[in-house]
């Protein structure tokens, strides 16, 4: 899970 993503999820 990425901490620097808008949501705690893996990008598409």
From Swiss-Prot:
In this UniProt entry, the residues modified to Pyrrolidone carboxylic acid are 1, 4
Q: Which GO terms describe its cellular component?
A: extracellular region
One Gene Ontology term of the molecular function aspect? toxin activity
What keywords are annotated for this sequence in UniProt? Hypotensive agent, Metalloenzyme inhibitor, Metalloprotease inhibitor, Pharmaceutical, Protease inhibitor, Pyrrolidone carboxylic acid, Secreted, Toxin
Compartments annotated for it: namely:
Secreted
Example GO BP: regulation of blood pressure
Which family does the record assign?
A: Belongs to the bradykinin-potentiating peptide family.
Additional remarks:
Bradykinin-potentiating peptide 9a-F is present only in female snakes.
Q: Provide the protein name.
A: Bradykinin-potentiating peptide 12c
């Amino acid at each position: 899970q990425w901490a620097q993503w808008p949501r705690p999820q893996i990008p598409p």
